[in-house]
Amino acid sequence: MEVFNIFPTTVYVGEMTKHDQYKKNFYDVYHKFDYEEDDVNNTVSENVGNPLIHHEDSLEELFSEVIHHVKTYTLDVLKYKNIFDYIITKTWLSRSRDEKSIPWHLHACAHISFVYYVNTPPKSHKLKFMNPHHKNSLWLGNKEGKYDHLKMIEEHNEVNAETFFIHPPEGHVALFPSTLHHSTESIEGFVGERLAIVGDVSCVLKKEYLQFSTGYINPQYWKIYQG
C-alpha cells in the first residue's frame, strides 16, 4: 500500500533572535500606534488609519529579521527561485485583552502575511487556519461536531481536519499565505494583553527579471497616475 498526502498548505514559525530588544523598542513607540477600542476596532488596529509600524526607524532591525524569515520561507521551504525582492506594504496591531476573537478573514492584497508575537501571557488566543481544500471531508458540512455521538470522524488530524490551530510562543513570527483564511480563538482563563505585530508582504521581481508573464515586475518600472 502507498499513501500520498498531496498539496499541503505550509505555515512557518521561526524564532526572532533579539526578541527582548525588539520588544523594548516596540514598547517605546507603542503609544504612537495605540488605539481606542470600540465595537469596530477591538482586536486589531488595521482600520484606524495608521498601518505604518514598519516605518519606525527604531524597528528597522526587527522588520529586517522578519524579512529574513520570509526569505527562508520562500526560498528554503517553498523552494522558489531567488528572483524576488520583498515589500512590507502595511503593518498593524493585533491585540486581545479579553475573550474577543478575530473572525475568519484573509488578506487578499498580499502574498505572505506575518504575525510577530510581542507579548503572549499564558492561555493567549490561538491562531486558527481553515482548510482551503476540504477534499478529505468527503462532503462539505462534515464538521467536528459538539457532541461525541454526532461526530463521524474517529480522530482529527492534519489529513481530515477542516481547521487547524497553533500556539506560537512569544518572540516567534508566524508566516502563511495571505489568502489562507485564518482567525483567533480565545482560551478560558486568559488574563492580560496578547500583543502582536501583523503585516503583509508582497513579492516583486528583482529589477533584472522582466521576462516572466506573471508576478509583479519591480516597482521601479511602475508609473503611478493620480486618481
Per-region residue spans from a language model:
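Short, cationic low-complexity segments
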Residues: 37-38, 134-143, 217-227
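Double-stranded beta-helix
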Residues: 128, 201-227
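Catalytic core of non-heme Fe(II) oxygenases with the double-stranded beta-helix
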Residues: 97-173, 185, 193, 197, ...
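Non-heme Fe(II)/2-oxoglutarate
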Residues: 1-82, 94, 99-101
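Short beta-strand segments enriched in hydrophobic/aromatic residues
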Residues: 118, 180, 201-203
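Short, proline-centered helix/strand-breaking motifs
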Residues: 175-179
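A short glycine-rich, His/Asp/Glu-containing loop-to-beta-strand
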Residues: 87-94
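Low-complexity, intrinsically disordered Gly/Pro/Thr-rich segments
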Residues: 180-186
